[in-house]
Amino acid sequence: MVIKPRVRGFICVTTHPVGCEANVKQQIDYVTQQGAIDAGPKNVLVLGASTGYGLAARITAAFGCGANTLGVFFERGSVDGKLGTAGWYNTAAFHKFAEEKGLYAKSINGDAFSDAVKAETIETIKRDLGKIDLVVYSLAAPRRTHPKTGEVLSSTLKPLGKSVTLRGVDTDKEIVKETTLQPATQEEIDGTVAVMGGEDWQMWIDALHEAGVLAEGAKTTAFTYLGEKLTHDIYWNGSIGEAKKDLDQKVIGMRQQLAGLGGDARVSVLKAVVTQASSAIPIMPLYLSLLFKVMKEQGSHEGCIEQVYGLYKDSLYNSEPVIDQEGRLRADYKELQPAVQDRVKQLWDQVTSENLYEMTDFVGYKQEFLRLFGFEIEGVDYEADVDPDVKISNLIQL
């Protein structure tokens, strides 16, 4: 079949297997060109390993550190000629390239929040790797079935305490408009913390620790975003921010837990990038379009792979990490420079539907968005016939 992008709202309902493979290859090439990371991890578990920052963390571990990687995610392959998800095709490509390099790569497809996936992961580590020395937590999900109660919890993107009116861009109609969001109820806040907070990360570390599969010196990190004033109402000071603050609280206990192994636990702050998760946040497409314009002009623009490679090299595996007062590892400092934020704010107030393309890098935003699904990748023939049925070698399906 010939596959073209079909976008509905903040999701692209088609995916391109060959484009996804080319996208993964570009990220691998970037890491390879940067060179090996000294004293990097050897056996790595990535939770949420199929797209965005999680995929970048897996690529950096394998191709920057020569690590064996075990990935966990919830994706869908092709059934009856229908297209699989981008994360499925990304992982098929990652496995292929890792195996060509002689690197161990295995993945578990299932609900990472469940006890069954945790148990299967532990058995796989014991059987194949013995122990792991890095756990990357990069799950972004709209819902979580609590493994102990069976309750289905949902995350919401809402402000706290009062309604908030935000500028944004309707990416379908390509118009700048204002959206008013009502404040989250306590139930919605609690649900968001349960889905996107630190409880499941803690459960993973507890389970791995109790099973004796964490190596001496094992580290764990979860990814977060802080942002600046423009995004605070909906993000850091909103329901999702409560979940991110929960990560900051839970990591303290995990740090003490891993200290017994000579290890460490840190939250890592990364810059705003286009992901399937961020494109769903009302303010983010406009903010990112402006951020891209300003950071490209200043020569400091980075995507997922540049951010994560830098995080490994400068902080996770560096004796002098970039760390803030709260103990978080920081890779977002280029985004937060006053010269960047002041310029973004200045342009923010001037953007209209009429000058959207002129004032922002909306073209770059749309391109990055489509790249998530395997489109807009240089060197890919999008007129060619493509088989949607791509198998993932060494996949454990739960």
UniProtKB/Swiss-Prot annotation:
Q: Quote the record's binding site residues for NAD(+).
A: 48-53, 74-75, 111-112, 139-140, 244, 273-275
Chain positions of site Plays an important role in discriminating NADH against NADPH = 75
Q: Does the keyword Oxidoreductase apply?
A: yes
For biological process, the GO terms are:
fatty acid biosynthetic process
**For substrate, which residues are the binding ones?**
225
| InterPro entries listed in its UniProt record | Eno_Rdtase_FAD-bd_dom (IPR024906), Enoyl-CoA_Rdtase_cat_dom (IPR024910), FabV-like_NADH_b (IPR050048), Trans-2-enoyl-CoA_reductase (IPR010758)
Leading EC class: oxidoreductase
> What Gene3D superfamilies does the record point to?
NAD(P)-binding Rossmann-like Domain
In terms of Pfam families, this protein maps to: Eno-Rase_FAD_bd, Eno-Rase_NADH_b, Enoyl_reductase
Q: Which UniProt keywords apply?
A: Fatty acid biosynthesis, Fatty acid metabolism, Lipid biosynthesis, Lipid metabolism, NAD, Oxidoreductase
Q: Which residues cross the membrane?
A: none
State the pathway, as annotated in the record.
Lipid metabolism; fatty acid biosynthesis
Give its E.C. classification number: 1.3.1.9
Q: Out of the domains of life, which is the source?
A: Bacteria
Q: Which reaction does it catalyse?
A: a 2,3-saturated acyl-[ACP] + NAD(+) = a (2E)-enoyl-[ACP] + NADH + H(+)
Task: List the active-site residues.
Answer: 235
What Gene Ontology terms describe what this protein does at the molecular function level?
enoyl-[acyl-carrier-protein] reductase (NADH) activity; NAD binding; trans-2-enoyl-CoA reductase (NADH) activity
Which family does the record assign?
Belongs to the TER reductase family.
Protein role: Involved in the final reduction of the elongation cycle of fatty acid synthesis (FAS II). Catalyzes the reduction of a carbon-carbon double bond in an enoyl moiety that is covalently linked to an acyl carrier protein (ACP).
PANTHER family listed in its UniProt record: ENOYL-[ACYL-CARRIER-PROTEIN] REDUCTASE [NADH]
How it assembles, according to the record, is: Monomer.
Under what name is this protein listed? Answer: Enoyl-[acyl-carrier-protein] reductase [NADH]
The organism's lineage?
Bacteria, Pseudomonadati, Pseudomonadota, Gammaproteobacteria, Pseudomonadales
